[in-house]
Regions:
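N-terminal single-pass transmembrane signal-anchor helix
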Residues: 4-28
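Membrane-interface elements of multi-pass transporters and channels
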Residues: 29, 33-34
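Short acidic-glycine loop/turn motifs at beta-strand connectors
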Residues: 102, 113-114, 150, 348-351, ...
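Periplasmic/extracellular, small/polar-rich flexible segments of pilin-like filament-forming proteins
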Residues: 61, 65-132
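Intrinsically disordered, low-complexity repeat and linker tracts
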Residues: 38-52, 118-140, 640-646
Length: 646
């Protein structure tokens, strides 16, 4: 019967439409915004809004009658939950409990927050109709389940307690959504939220507690890069076993963090995850984790105990970089097949690689690398300032400069070592073509002629040097090869340089100028910047004291890390000829407040172009919205920082 009635109504509507058309009424008049169809939709919608308002008022009145202590400001309701201050523990409910007589088509789009009812819609007509009925809409910015970066999201902050409760309709906390916002002390994330994106809470310097809830297997599955970076008051993090992925530097610089409960479903602990977590004293790595990535614990100077599981298969060589000064105990599951702890050292099972050295292992001022060791990892001895001498055995085949402590005065290499020699406090390859490490404390350092390559961090511990004379034979500067050397202001490179990139100058905060021999066929240096010979690509800008720089017209590409770590720059002007900006181009330009991307740019290659630019709150793009992929390109403030002009 119902089916027949439905068919009859449809036939009637079709008949009316045909008659209207025959009478000369246009299709647009029938179906347009002012047509009868739209008016019928409006009337139906407004009827449901009116019913919702009435039922909400009745529900609130009933609660007040039942208990005079009921506070309307505590009433919250969504698709799966209902809460108010006098709610009995036995009561189960949700938004449908409140709006039981409203068309279910609409009920799911209502939400009660702090005693106010709102309607959520991306339909502009519905939003207007709701407002005409006195119904508030969209109190926070959500698009397709993603809570996006917007100042409107402060509505979710309970100013009395400093608590933000993420609403149930939120499936993802978007990139930079709450980054840098003040007054947040506690965050509650419901099981309905599946993802916390990059920099979501970056720089919340009042945040003390993060509560990530789960309901069985339902809950947050991934937490993005830098999500809680620079939350300097965050003390405790407890995550459910729903979490499978943790991004790089997720807790970086959380200097108050004392305890972390990790999910057992995570397989990889990402780079820099606990970087500079200087209050972290104990870390239990749950079984299930297979890999610990580079610089995972860098600067975790208070770490005393760490427990490693049977499942662990790989540890990056610099995982414990500058993190062992307080380390007293490394506990390793006895069934682990890949590592052993011996004489206070964490070693590979075959005893060929050192990963970490505990505090009690260091006696006296000499450290003898055990015989049989082939690889010495970065940062292993860095915290131990009492070490003056390091002895390397014949077996060592791979050296990283970061292995050695700042205090080292002598490195003795076994005369039968086939790979390395030591000359004038410089560790070189046997053929003298590669410089691996220089530890001279002289004011003027002259590198050996014949050197063709300088390795990563090779000069980092030449912290007294004011002048470094580079050999004319030099061909290649590897990434971070000029890291450190804070007192060297000017660099002169010869005509044979054929490999240099912006990453060479990462974490160098001293250089102010660079000169390259005019006969060099590959590069040219002007005004503290390095370009390809045709000046179409800028490789690096090196002046650490500069506050502004204008890239000359004609430059088409900004290469990777070109402006990285230029922390005093407050203005960078890009040319109208620019077409490409590569990843990390402006990494750690921490004083830069704004930048304009010209219309000529065709590609911004990488999510981390503005990574760690803590002051960057405005990216002006002289193009149509969405015409460049990757927005906001690593800016911690998310899309609220991006202004499209067209």
């Amino acid at each position: 019967m119902n089916r027949e009635r439905g068919i009859t109504l449809i036939a009637l509507v079709i008949t009316i439409i045909i008659l209207l058309i025959l009478a000369g009424v246009t299709i647009s008049a029938i179906f347009g915004e002012e047509g009868p169809i739209a008016r019928a939709q409006e009337a139906s919608f407004k009827t449901e809004i009116a019913k919702a308002k009435e039922q909400f008022d009745i529900y609130v009145s009933e609660k007040k009658v039942l208990n005079q202590e009921f506070e309307i400001g505590t009433l919250n309701a969504g698709e799966t939950s209902l809460y108010y201050n006098t709610k009995p523990e036995t009561e189960i409910g949700n938004i449908y409990t409140v709006l039981f007589n409203v068309n279910k088509k609409y009920v799911k789009d209502f939400e009660i927050i702090k005693g106010e009812m709102f309607y959520f819609t991306q339909n502009e007509r519905e939003a207007q109709w709701a407002l005409e009925m006195g119904m508030k809409t969209n109190p926070y910015e959500i698009i397709n389940g993603v809570l996006i970066s917007s100042d409107k999201n402060l509505f979710l902050l309970d100013e009395a307690t400093g608590t933000i409760t993420i609403p149930e309709r939120v499936k993802e906390v978007g990139e930079g959504t709450f980054a840098g916002l003040k007054g947040i002390k506690r965050i509650i994330i419901p099981p309905t939220c599946k993802r916390i994106n990059n920099s979501a809470f970056n720089g919340n310097d009042t945040l003390e507690e993060v509560l990530i809830l789960a309901d069985g297997d339902q809950g947050v599955e991934s937490i993005g890069n830098y999500a809680f970076k620079d939350c300097i008051k965050l003390k405790v993090v407890s995550m459910p076993n729903t979490v499978r992925v943790l991004g790089t530097t997720v807790f970086g610089n959380c200097s108050s963090l004392e305890k972390v409960q990790l999910s057992s479903r995570i397989e990889v602990l990402s780079n820099n995850m606990f970087q500079n977590c200087s209050s972290l004293k104990e870390l239990l790595i749950p079984n299930g984790i297979r890999e610990m990535k580079g610089f995972l614990l860098q600067g975790a100077i208070s770490l005393i105990n760490i427990s490693l599981p049977a499942s662990l298969e790989k540890i990056d060589n610099n995982c414990f970089y500058d993190a062992t000064s307080s380390l007293q105990n490394i506990s390793l599951d006895g069934s682990n097949q890949h590592f052993i702890v011996k004489n206070g050292m964490l070693l590979s099972k075959d005893e060929k690689q050192i990963y970490a050295v505990t505090k009690g292992t260091i006696n006296g001022n000499t450290f003898n690398v055990p015989k049989g060791i082939t690889y010495v990892g970065s940062g292993t001895l860095m915290p131990y300032t009492n070490i003056k001498k390091v002895v390397l055995p014949e077996s060592v085949t791979s050296i990283e400069a970061g292995f050695f402590p700042w205090s080292v005065e002598e490195i003795e290499i076994h005369p039968n070592n086939p790979n390395y020699i030591s000359i004038n406090k410089q560790i070189l390859s046997k053929d003298k073509k590669i410089l691996y490490f220089c530890y001279s404390k002289e004011l003027i350092i002259t590198l050996e002629e014949g050197i063709e390559e300088i390795s990563e961090s090779a000069l980092e511990k030449c912290n007294n040097a004011k002048t470094i004379n580079f050999p004319t034979s030099l061909k290649r500067l590897k990434p971070q090869s000029l890291k450190g050397i804070y007192n060297v202001k000017n660099i002169k490179l010869g005509r044979n340089i054929e490999e240099i990139c912006g990453e060479v100058f990462l974490y160098n905060f001293g250089i102010q100028n660079i000169e390259i021999d005019s006969r060099n066929p590959n590069f040219i240096a002007e005004n503290a910047a390095i370009y390809t010979k045709d000046k179409k690509k800028i490789i690096a800008f090196v002046n650490n004291e500069a506050t502004s720089f204008k890239i000359p017209e004609g430059v088409k590409e900004i290469k990777q890390s070109a402006f990285s770590c230029r922390e005093k720059l407050t203005s960078i002007v890009l040319p109208e000829t620019l077409t490409l900006i590569e990843n990390s181009a402006f990494y750690k330009c921490s004083a830069l407040p704004t930048i304009t991307i010209p219309n000529s740019v065709e590609k911004m290659d990488g999510w981390g172009i503005f990574d760690d630019c803590s002051a960057l709150k405005e990216i002006i793009v002289d193009k149509e919205r969405g015409s460049l992929n990757g927005s906001p390109w690593g800016c911690i403030y998310g899309d609220r920082a991006v202004k499209w002009l067209r």
